[in-house]
């Protein structure tokens, strides 16, 4: 039986290329032996839209696409940093987007998948912000801004977190 692999919170960004190199080696090596790869959020340090692909995002899409071409199913769940990853990038990378919570059958065991930020239930302010950024209307409004404006918003959010 081929393994099912899970990764999360890599926080990839152009400024830290070593992490992207590690992921590339993983995708071209051990991951090729898997039946599926689940990415459970925060693959990227930030994501400002599928229309603003960084060199890192392009490199990752190529690696994930190559993995999918070898028959490994790849799934993506949004995190608190990359909640704007959309269908366009998912298609480019050969990933299937998942809902916020999902129960899968992991070799006969029901297994709940989620990004850990949903468990910060005592942090009322964070949960309110989380609901806002996951709202499709809010996301559409943000995505209607220029790339420069979205980048500035992302930098401000990173500084505040």
Predicted region positions:
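Active-site-proximal loop/helix segment associated with metal-binding centers of metalloenzymes
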Residues: 114-161
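Well-ordered beta-strand scaffold positions
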Residues: 102, 109-111, 117
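Short, charged/polar low-complexity linear motifs in solvent-exposed/disordered segments
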Residues: 32, 64-65, 94, 109, ...
